[in-house]
A protein has these predicted regions:
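Catalytic core of non-heme Fe(II) oxygenases with the double-stranded beta-helix
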Residues: 1-117
Length: 117
């Protein structure tokens, strides 16, 4: 079934690891289910901001042409390892119906974002 993914966000960690656990056979469209990244890192202060302020910060960042989005396609039994402060989102999901075909993603965050002086 077709569903929207997790909207644009950044993780409050140093390194994020996403494990995609659902087999490829469940994915009805190889163009869906992956992650889009922007080459922009949120500032450390971002994590203490209100939800409205976070939205404004992220929108301004992804509107910048230098943000240059790129997609990492979904793959069952695949790992995506990235700097947590990079803006990213889950792309639209189009997987087969049924519990056993749900897109399962396990995310582990390591460390805290480093503060630069």
């Amino acid at each position: 079934s077709r569903r929207s993914g997790v909207p644009v966000h950044a993780d409050d960690g140093k390194i994020s690891i996403n494990f995609w656990l659902t087999p490829d056979e469940a994915n009805l469209n190889s163009e869906t289910g992956g992650l889009t990244f922007w080459k922009e890192r949120v500032p450390i202060r971002f994590f203490g901001e209100s939800p409205d302020e976070k939205s404004k910060i992220m929108q301004k960042m992804i509107d910048d042409p230098a943000a240059d989005p790129f997609v990492v396609p979904y793959g069952g039994n695949k790992v995506a390892l990235f700097e947590s402060r990079l803006l990213h989102k889950t792309n639209e999901v189009d997987f087969k119906d049924g519990y056993e075909n749900r897109r399962v993603n396990l995310t582990i965050l390591y460390g805290r974002p480093l503060q630069h002086h």
